[in-house]
Amino acid sequence: MAGSGMKSLAKDTAIYGLSSILGRVLNWFLMPLHISIFTNTIEYGKVSRIYGLTALFLVLLTYGLETGFFRFMNKKEENADKVYSTSLITIGCTSLLFILFSICFITPISEWLRYTDHREHIMIMAIVVALDAFMTIPFAYLRQQKRPKRFAALKLAFIFFNIFFNLFFLVFCPWIKEAYPDFILNKFYHQDIGIGYIFLANLISTLAVLILLIPTTMKGLKIDFDKSLLGRLLKYSFPLLMLGLAGVISQTVAQLVYPYIFDSVEEADRQLGIYSACVKFSVIISMFIQAFRYAYEPFFFGKNKDGKDNTKSYADAMKYFIIFVLLIFLVVMFYIDIIQYIMHRIGRNYAIGLDVLPYAMMGEIFFGIYFNLSVWYKLTDKTKYGAYFSILGCVIQVVMNIVLVPIYGYIASAWATFACNLIIAAISYFIGQKYFPIKYDLKNIFLYFVLATVFYIAAMYPQIDNELLRMGYRTLFLIAFAAIVIKKDLPLSEIPIINRYFKRYK
């Protein structure tokens, strides 16, 4: 692994990744809990739809300001305290306005979203998304100040709160109601609220983290709003809103369009419930991308600040990123029998959708590549290209879903995500080489993709009835791929944590 910069990036990725991976894994366990309790796929489809809308509005309410915050905090000519204060005040005001707007227009909003039976679900999550948007700047401040442990602790606190209150409302309270009918708690618990308790648990957890976050990031904060600075921030950040929309649509396009392309909302929610539950298994790719992103943005902005040519570091980061995501892809697909067993045990009605998984994971991989490539227009302040790519991606996603989902079903959503991210990544690469040339190791990157594809086909194609023999056969290909990677580009003595053992036995 080349250079001290890569070791620093790997170390930060490991710290952020620990919280991201642990948090995502813990949060993932809510999916089995939910589908085992709400066996009707329509109910889980409603949950998925609301969270898809929440993700979309979170991007809209942060309007790219998180990345703009990093950019301006690293500019020598800008006052860091003023950047923080201006960003915080701006996003706080827009979040408050969003809550007030949602309260005043909840009826037409729920009708427009085709979610009229439980408007309170929308209202609860409107408050949640506004609070989440406000907290993006304090969390970004922790990253900027190189406080990954505090950042990780607060992120994990939310996960633990959320899991606790989900278990409290969905498991403990029903058990108390059945075992002890006269218990005082039963007066406040109403089982017919159903999935509403999922959203209520989220709201309580968000408020708890906000209370913990404020003393850490706002102690001694000077209120200093600079209108001129805000204009520069928005000019830089607003095009990144489109980039953010591309990312969120890549993950939530089904939740956004299904209610409008099926004959009934119930059928849309049924298909969405199956699709969403199975796509959750691609979380291992997305959480690695998230961990990498947390470390990579401060890394490349910080590198750019020192005025040196760091394109070699960016190229190395891309190659190692691709190596790891391909390894993750092969691990998940080679042991998909375990996933199938889990799904049949906890949610038989959902298991039929697992055929979406390879396409969903490849879609995530190419979105990660696209994020890596975005370094060229972020560092050259040509963020308008991010907007162009995002608009193109949105069009591809929406058109493919509208045209193909009614014919082929939910699997077409996974195809659309894969195709969209592949296309915009390719276009970004070719345009980026014109404005900010980076010599990526295309030869080895292409080789690893070919090897992964060949090994995947060779491992998955033979029909081996015995499960242990089947997984053992596939494991041989996984070992072979890992051995090639280690031999060519990833000596074990250079990997953080593992390298300690090599030093010990030298």
Regions of interest found by a model, annotated:
Residues 2, 461-506:
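Membrane-proximal transmembrane or re-entrant/amphipathic helices at the cytosolic face
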Residues 12-27, 198-213, 217, 227-301, ...:
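Transmembrane helical elements of multi-pass membrane transporters/channels
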Residues 41, 107-125, 269, 332-365:
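Interfacial segments at transmembrane-helix termini and the short loops linking adjacent helices
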